[in-house]
């Protein structure tokens, strides 16, 4: 499945947050969206997930898609997993998204079992979600979206509140979902444990001004991309020594990562 954005814009209180955005997202791929705070990253994810109605054209496999159709095909996962906990047990939390679809109990049980296996939560069906670790809560949020048989996941800083081992767990889940044919679109700058991303999109002033591989991204210069983020990518490319030479010669000093 492919989502196509054609001259998509979004205004808030009359001011453009996104303007004339053109992009394509395919299943079986991982897309990382970067840019400074307020550049429109979260707005883009919410438009893709059908949570905001935008100007312009959005297509699913070439056919026009309204927000309702997007919500059926794109699951949105918030930064704070606790904000999505609804049920008193893990299985009830997943079941909630299925009940509103009108599925019978047999089909619900099959889907719950499948998605909990996919995210590594088998055996915790009767647990209180509030007692789960941060990483487990985030996996539960992902499972709840997958239970609806969404083709894409849009995740807004899904690991920013987690410790490194939990970050690794979440990225391993996302990579396995990519291999299952899901499309993954996420905002993050925590890249140490994400080994299988396909594309990086850079947003500046509400417009996507770059979409390409991370090898291509590190060769470009962006005023709002901080040195620690570049360092992570150079390390992934196996070019860290070359990057350090550039860094030392530039006279720059490392600053806090803001992408």
UniProtKB/Swiss-Prot annotation:
CDD domains under this entry? ABC_cobalt_CbiO_domain1
Active site positions:
157 (proton acceptor)
Q: Which UniProt keywords apply?
A: ATP-binding, Cell inner membrane, Cell membrane, Membrane, Nucleotide-binding, Translocase, Transport
Predominantly, its location class is membrane
Q: What class of enzyme is it?
A: translocase
**Binding-site residues, ATP:** 38-43
User: Source organism's superkingdom?
Assistant: Bacteria
One example of a Gene Ontology biological process annotation: riboflavin transport
MF annotations from Gene Ontology: ATP binding; ATP hydrolysis activity; ATPase-coupled transmembrane transporter activity; riboflavin transmembrane transporter activity
Any additional notes? Structure 4HLU is probably in the open state.
Give the family from UniProt: Belongs to the ABC transporter superfamily. Energy-coupling factor EcfA family.
Q: What is this protein called?
A: Energy-coupling factor transporter ATP-binding protein EcfA1
Which species does this protein come from?
Answer: Thermotoga maritima (strain ATCC 43589 / DSM 3109 / JCM 10099 / NBRC 100826 / MSB8)
From the UniProt record, report the name of the gene that encodes this protein.
ecfA1
């Amino acid at each position: 499945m492919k989502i196509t954005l054609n001259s998509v814009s979004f205004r808030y209180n009359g001011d453009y947050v996104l303007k004339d955005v053109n992009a394509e997202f395919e299943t079986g791929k991982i897309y990382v969206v970067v840019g400074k705070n307020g550049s429109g990253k979260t707005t883009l994810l919410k438009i893709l997930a059908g949570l905001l109605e935008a100007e312009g054209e959005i297509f699913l496999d070439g056919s026009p898609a309204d927000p309702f159709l997007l919500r059926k095909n794109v699951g949105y996962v918030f930064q704070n997993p606790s904000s999505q906990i609804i049920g008193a047990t893990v299985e009830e939390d997943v079941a909630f998204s299925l009940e509103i679809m009108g599925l019978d109990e047999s089909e619900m049980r099959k889907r719950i079992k499948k998605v909990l296996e996919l995210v590594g939560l088998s055996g915790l069906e009767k647990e209180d979600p509030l007692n789960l670790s941060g990483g487990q809560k985030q996996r539960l949020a992902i499972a709840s979206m997958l239970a609806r048989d969404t083709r894409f996941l849009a995740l807004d800083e899904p690991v920013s509140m987690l410790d490194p081992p939990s970050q690794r767990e979440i990225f391993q889940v996302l990579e396995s979902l990519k291999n299952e044919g899901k499309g993954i679109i996420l905002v993050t700058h925590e890249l140490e444990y994400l080994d299988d991303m396909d594309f990086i999109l850079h947003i500046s002033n509400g417009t996507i001004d770059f979409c390409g591989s991370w090898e291509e991204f590190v060769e470009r210069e962006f005023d709002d991309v901080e040195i620690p983020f570049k360092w992570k990518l150079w390390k992934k490319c196996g070019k860290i020594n070359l990057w350090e030479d550039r860094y030392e010669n530039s006279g720059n000093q490392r600053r806090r990562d803001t992408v």
